[in-house]
Amino acid sequence: MRLFIAALIPDAVRDALHQAREQLQRAAPDRALRWVAPENYHITLLFLGEQDEARLPAIVQAMEAARAGVPPFTVAVQGLGVFPNWNRPNVLWAGVSEGGRLLGQMAAALERTLLPAPSGKPFHPHITLARLKTPCRDADGLKKRLYDATERFALASFGRYELRSISLMQSTLTPDGSVYTKLHAVAL
């Protein structure tokens, strides 16, 4: 089973992000951008990859430990950007301007408990909107169009919501893209 742990987002935030995505697609139409389906928008706390089903109870136990002492809290989704940078954009994302510290706290606890060798990379809470296929034709032109299109959303607010749970998700890869299924939720 291909698994990850996520903070899911409400429909209002999803709809605001989808409206921005539609504007971006018109401004930077390019087959080199692989857009994430709006129903798959989420904030990844930890990607676990392929896991044996027998490990599910330990994963849920780690989720419960990671959220211990964390009450429901506000998450604000604001601005667009790219990873790793505008010279080599691979991922187009919407950022988290509020709630990132608590998301990071839970992500770090999950990583310490569930990964044999924690990555040591800093946690950057975000919602992936698109991935850039590499290599792509006219990469410089695409970067310019994408930069120009996202600049107007640099500080845009896509909504705030109260995060009340974290979810264990299964990702099934299909020719039409990933299909996500919620396996378990742990309340904050």
Predicted regions, residues:
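Histidine-dependent nucleotide/RNA phosphoesterase domain, centered on the 2H-phosphoesterase fold
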Residues: 1-188
